Amino acid sequence: MSEPFMNAPWQPPGDHPALKSPQPTGILIDSVRKLYPARKASAEVVALDDISLNVPKGSILGVIGRSGAGKSTLIRLINGLDKPTAGRVVVNDVEITSLDEPALRRARRSIGMVFQHFNLLSSRTAFANVALPLEIAGTPKAEIEKRVLPLLDMVGLADKRDRYPAELSGGQKQRVGIARALATEPAVLLSDEATSALDPETTDQILDLLKQINRDLHLTILFITHEMAVVKALADRVAVIEAGRIVEEGATFDVFATPRHEVTRRFVSSVTGSGAPDWLLAQLQPLQPPGGKAVLRVTFKGSDASQPLLSRVARTLGVDLNILFGQVEMIAGHPFGTLIVSLDASPDVLRQVIAQLSAGNNLVEQLGYVA
């Protein structure tokens, strides 16, 4: 990893629940606020409001939020491009927020950055773009050659070393950007919407590459995104940011399986299809019409997703369960499924059906009725 440097005294994290972790800390964000003062006709802007996060070393945290939620401000504070109004940012045991400019420049060598629009120099080849941070750091030419060639090989561009950005595809440009971010052998990798300018197939390839880098180099990765599909594919943990505050944070599977905040539920629904399809929503009624059927949404988590629960309930209670919609997928290595069913049952039998379907980790919601 990067060379040692003098750093400001670091103190253990405070008492905020988000800061407690049994693992060594890669990134610590402790009670951070960022205010932009009022200017002329513009009022004061609270960009970040009491943000606390603990990213264990070697883990991958996804920070998701809508435009203007505070994601970009957060990443600027982590890499020292801006300072918080209050609170601390600690990266690889170095308190970034208290460093002077020379120490901050040294500290940034332990932080790699991947950008949305690649930020490659058009006049430099792929090799020269990756070599740039090493040249700036004064690394000897022979050492640069030893460092850059394996990185180009790692990202699958060994045969493109002499190509210019104009000769590369979007995915290849981002691979150059990733190799450049790794050139100084950082302990932490930050990613700012690294896949949002790419097509779906290339996005999957870049996410696979980031997972491989995390495994092989044991890097701590923090990425920001507005796409829950990226979180699902890459993150160990996810933090949801809204209006400058963390509204939900936890293991990726837990957040997908049991989203607590309305913003999180909207993000999750966009990926898992756990929301009812439009054609069904158009038919749902809040009150039971004559001859109408109740509509239930059953969310299965973990091992419960592979159990024959519907057939068991149908046999036990003597009811017919009509499947209107369903899917099962893997999230963070765990199965997660959603089924929407309709049934014709008395209120008493309906209560029994809901009780039996709610066994284990399942979540059952009555959505309404259909004619």
From Swiss-Prot:
ATP binds at residues 65-72. The gene is metN. Disulfide bonds: none annotated. Its EC number is 7.4.2.11. SMART domains: AAA, NIL. Transmembrane segments: none annotated. Its main location: membrane. InterPro entries: AAA+_ATPase, ABC_transporter-like_ATP-bd, ABC_transporter-like_CS, ACT-like_dom_sf, MetN_ABC, MetN_ABC_transporter-like, NIL_domain, P-loop_NTPase. Keywords: Amino-acid transport, ATP-binding, Cell inner membrane, Cell membrane, Membrane, Nucleotide-binding, Translocase, Transport. It comes from Rhodopseudomonas palustris (strain BisB5). Part of the ABC transporter complex MetNIQ involved in methionine import. Responsible for energy coupling to the transport system. Belongs to the ABC transporter superfamily. Methionine importer (TC 3.A.1.24) family. It holds the Pfam family NIL. It is a peripheral membrane protein. It is an enzyme of class 7 (translocase). Residues 1-22 are annotated as: Disordered. The complex is composed of two ATP-binding proteins (MetN), two transmembrane proteins (MetI) and a solute-binding protein (MetQ). This is Methionine import ATP-binding protein MetN. Residues 27-268 form the ABC transporter domain. It catalyses: L-methionine(out) + ATP + H2O = L-methionine(in) + ADP + phosphate + H(+); D-methionine(out) + ATP + H2O = D-methionine(in) + ADP + phosphate + H(+). GO terms for cellular component: plasma membrane. One of its GO terms (molecular function) is ATP hydrolysis activity. It is found in: Cell inner membrane.
